[in-house]
């Protein structure tokens, strides 16, 4: 294969970008997915902001491209929020922020430099609880995203959706946990049918399907391969614990009055993300997870996937410890778990990435004004 392996910068919330570049070189990766969340957003978990999105100019783009090119690194940008649901103010802020990231990607060369924009879609629960709520969310998605995708297409930029259901985005008292429209393959195919443009695609994270007892290799085979631009590397270990015995592993653990639960001897969720019996891991770090990574990678080889693998470190025993040493150990282990399948075995060097990538094109694009959803929908 010879795919690039990248790191996602969400694990380094407190570090400046220069320090993260040093970490990337230390881990022997070839690129970074730069998290560029809004500083005004309501989401607080797994967020980071590693570019000045409010003051990003064509000169900033040129300096960033020259810097990363000199370091042998590539990059994309991403922010993962609810763009079709939640309260109106947050929704509008998130939509406008995504438009800022599309502009940044354009200034950095967009598809010419493989600078994609990672995002969620989110979910509108007010529509979702109605009869036909899923289909209503599809049409709300089309209403909001059709002009966004057209804007990206006109600028030569591709938007890519990640498939996390965001099961912890609602209170633990909420009965269902589907909070991000592209969480299933069926939803993604329906989305592309509604907006046929090639200016949007997906980042596939197999860990979310693993805890739903779906084989990610089957999903990859059924995916429109032209839409698959990134793979997030994150692992899941399905747990056989008291929670799975009492609640099963398909439906979310439900919350009831804790005094009643204690009398009945029934476990209830302790926080919003405590809904399913699994543990977040990284491949090869701290034991086995519940996916056959070799089968998964070989399936991607079969379909000719030649895009980056991006390590997203949310592992309980790595980034979630808050220990920078453990965080880097997790990243490095994941790299070397993937390397024997992805990279070439060189004499006396071991498994090595063969860097035959074209150089980053230093963009000479002129600044364009920031646009808003109100302007796109006018």
Model-identified regions with their sequence ranges:
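Residue-level recognition of beta-strand->loop/alpha-helix junctions
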Residues: 9-11, 35-36, 79, 163
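Active-site-proximal beta-alpha loop/turn segments in soluble metabolic enzymes
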Residues: 121-134, 160-179, 319-320
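Histidine-acidic metal/acid-base catalytic patches
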Residues: 1-9, 13-28, 69, 88, ...
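Conserved Rossmann-fold SDR core element
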Residues: 158-160, 203
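Asparagine-centered polar/low-complexity signal
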Residues: 82-83, 163-165, 199, 208
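Eukaryote-skewed repeat-based solenoidal scaffolds used as protein-protein interaction platforms
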Residues: 138-139, 149, 168, 187-189
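Structural motif corresponding to the early beta-alpha repeats
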Residues: 3, 29-30, 34-143, 147-158, ...
């Amino acid at each position: 294969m010879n795919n690039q392996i990248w790191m996602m910068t969400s694990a380094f919330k407190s570090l400046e970008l220069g320090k993260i570049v040093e970490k990337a070189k230390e881990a022997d990766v070839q690129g970074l997915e730069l998290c560029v969340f809004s500083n005004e957003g309501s989401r607080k978990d797994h967020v980071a902001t590693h570019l000045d999105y409010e003051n990003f100019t064509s000169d900033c783009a040129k300096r960033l491209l020259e810097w990363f090119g000199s370091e042998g690194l590539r990059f994309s940008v991403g922010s993962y929020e609810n763009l079709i649901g939640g309260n109106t103010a947050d929704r509008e802020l998130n939509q406008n922020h995504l438009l800022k990231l599309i502009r940044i990607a354009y200034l950095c060369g967009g598809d010419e430099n493989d600078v994609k924009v990672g995002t969620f879609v989110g979910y509108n629960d007010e529509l979702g609880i109605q009869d036909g709520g899923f289909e209503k969310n599809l049409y709300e998605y089309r209403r909001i995203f059709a002009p966004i995708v057209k804007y990206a297409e006109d600028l030569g930029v591709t938007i890519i959706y990640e498939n996390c259901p965001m099961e912890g985005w609602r209170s633990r008292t909420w009965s269902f946990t589907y909070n991000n429209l592209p969480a299933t393959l069926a939803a993604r195919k329906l989305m592309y049918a509604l907006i046929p443009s090639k200016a949007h695609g997906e980042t596939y994270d197999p860990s979310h399907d693993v805890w739903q007892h779906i084989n990610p290799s089957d999903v990859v085979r059924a995916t429109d391969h032209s839409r698959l631009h990134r793979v997030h590397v994150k692992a899941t270990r399905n747990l056989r614990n008291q929670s799975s015995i009492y609640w099963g592993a398909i439906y979310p653990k439900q919350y009831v009055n804790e005094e009643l639960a204690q009398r009945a001897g029934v476990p209830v969720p302790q926080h919003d993300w405590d809904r399913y019996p699994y543990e977040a891991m990284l491949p090869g770090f701290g034991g086995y997870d519940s996916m056959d990574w070799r089968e998964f990678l070989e399936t991607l080889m079969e379909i000719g996937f030649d895009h980056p693998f991006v390590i997203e470190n949310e592992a309980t025993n790595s980034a979630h410890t808050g220990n920078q040493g453990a965080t880097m150990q997790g990243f490095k282990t994941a790299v070397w778990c993937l390397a024997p399948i992805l990279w070439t075995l060189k004499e006396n060097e071991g498994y090595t990435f063969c860097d035959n990538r074209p150089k980053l094109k230093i963009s000479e694009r002129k600044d364009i004004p920031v646009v808003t959803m109100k302007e796109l929908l006018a």
